[in-house]
Regions:
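Acidic, His- and aromatic-enriched active-site or binding-groove loops in soluble protein domains
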Residues: 28-44
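Sec-exported extracytoplasmic/periplasmic mature domains
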Residues: 1-4, 63, 67, 156-164
Length: 179
């Protein structure tokens, strides 16, 4: 019987939050989109502009919009591990949980999903599931929040592999799961 020797992990990549057409933030109603490049819509969007002055004006306007947090690239929280990437644009516009950033409100007839992911990963609704059972895991143990980046070093440890050095995850963060 192989079962007593198996370590089984069930996880997901993220949680989900309910969205609604009534909770949209159409940026075009607040800023001049002609001189702004918008990449993406949903829980967040990236904005850029060739004009530094236009970028500053856009930033200052967006800071005053309810249910919206706007970050200059250098101010993006370090815990997200991506502000220094070359693909990250000048501004990150992040909606509050359940709200959606859009360029234009297309009205009630346009399609909108009833839920999404991509909000701040500190929100409970964005947390992934994590279930584990097997000879290396404590029995009936309930862990504090587990960050997905820590699962790779955990699996590498279980398989007795040396994890790649250039990762953000740490086995120490999930050591409490192990016997």
């Amino acid at each position: 019987d192989i079962y007593p020797y198996l370590n089984i992990i069930v996880t997901s990549d993220h949680g989900m939050a309910e969205t609604s057409r009534k909770r949209q933030i159409p940026l075009k109603e607040h800023i001049d989109m002609k001189s702004i490049t918008m990449e993406g819509s949903g829980p967040y969007s990236f904005l850029s502009s060739k004009s530094k002055k236009n970028l500053e004006n856009t930033y200052n306007i967006l800071k005053g919009i309810p249910h919206l947090t706007v970050y200059l690239k250098n101010d993006i929280p370090d815990r997200w591990h991506f502000k220094n990437h070359y693909r990250i644009k000048d501004l990150l516009v992040l909606a509050d949980e359940g709200w959606t950033v859009v360029e234009t409100d297309h009205g009630p007839s346009s399609y909108m999903s009833k839920g999404t992911h991509g909000y701040d990963n500190a929100l409970r609704s964005m947390h992934a599931i994590f279930l584990a059972q097997g000879p290396v895991f404590k029995i009936n143990y309930f862990s504090p929040v587990i960050n997905n980046i820590d699962i790779y070093p955990l699996v590498a440890h279980i398989l007795r592999l040396e994890p790649f050095n250039g990762i953000d995850g740490k086995l120490d963060n999930v050591q409490g799961l192990l016997k």
